[in-house]
């Protein structure tokens, strides 16, 4: 029998998956995202779970499994929650999960490198692989490592991330020390680090990864202006949760 209607919400009423990232792998679409707890006191308290449906029948969703748990990350339990993730198929055919850790109410969520986990299947049990790193092996901490999105662009692995507030748009920045101190507290950086960026430590950035899915191949750079006043982005500036699609 032909189905004529798709209902929303399509997930169970006690399931909360914000920051949704749907991806088609094979003949199914997989929905990845953060995982809020019903009645929870802060963001993203539950481990990552995945739902999927046939690409030709988006009424037939099923819960796959919990694919990754916060305590698999070495930052746990100091940071015990996982924020907006993304998944990509690498050039080796494996699946790679990118995410950032955080604490209660987002505390600490801007202070750690981007974590990576790997699995042989889209909805299997992912294993911690490592952190995005510089060529010398040190953790990559350029700009604010938050809410990653990743794209396999015909074999080129592009990683997008960042967050944005308007502190540095204020006419008295950095003379008004309150703005600098706010960034120091939020991002876990020194004053010298904050002011060392010729553009800004904030804003949406992109880097290119090696095929190992961890090592930086091309250094991060802004993809749109951080300072949006007077630009075409002024009415809709970037905030967070990069989500990229190739069209």
Question: What feature does the model see in each segment?
Answer:
Residues 1-247:
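Carbohydrate-active catalytic/glycan-binding domains of CAZyme proteins
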